[in-house]
Amino acid sequence: MAVLGKFIIDLRLDGYHFCLLANNGQLLYDSTGFASEEGVMKGIETFKKACEGNDFVIYQDKFGRFRFVLNKRYIGEDYKERAQCEKVTASVQRFAKDSVVVPYTPDPEKEQAYAEAKANAKTGKDIDWEAVKNEPVPPSGKFEVEEEGDGYHFSLLANNGQLMFYSRSYATEKSCVEGIRTFQKAAYIGNFIIDQDKFDRYRFVLRSGSGVIVYIGESYTTRDRALKSVESVKKFARSATIVFPYRG
């Protein structure tokens, strides 16, 4: 008899997520948010097909963390050891195809919170970006652009070197720098929410003014630490200088 995992669906402030769990309950993959229940169901099927294609690559970032990237689209959890990441990657391949999908259970409280979060999102249309650009702000923190195995990433670092945000991959250096500019605008507009998943991890979710681009922050064990990370991102993102260590 096959050992089955399961897909569970959870509604959070940034949308409907699906999580792939092993048969022992271990989290193997947590998706980004989808706008609707129908969207997340389609997302599960697309993820399954991607797993069948077996286009998994394991990367190590500049902070020594390992994660799998599937089909250049799905990014796994962070792990301290390559062996851990390889084990989880094998489990995703093993469980994704035949895992049962646990239907979403309607939750009026969560649905109301999600609706309010969408309704209260700011667009930034009333912001004079030229005036913002010309406001005198002392440099603080830095964006580090790095060329890694899956492309270019940027990291937002505080003055003491603490990691505030680590981006997805970009195909070119130019697109990565453009990504920084978009991130800076999003942080200034300020559509931050604190996401708590079923495993009691907290992280910020930042949406761009258009709502199309989503940035996921680092994971924390308490809401307070996640809230502090939001304030740090707001503080440093606006005035951080952009550096390219690999240029020498």
Give residue ranges: language-model regions.
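C2H2-type zinc-finger recognition helix
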Residues: 37, 82, 173, 223-227
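A structural feature that tracks compact, well-ordered secondary-structure segments
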Residues: 17-21, 28-33, 43, 59, ...
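Intrinsic disorder/low-complexity detector
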Residues: 1-15, 25, 49-64, 93-151, ...
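Structured core of small recognition/catalytic domains
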Residues: 174, 188-191, 231-248
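Amphipathic alpha-helical interaction modules
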Residues: 39-55, 184-188
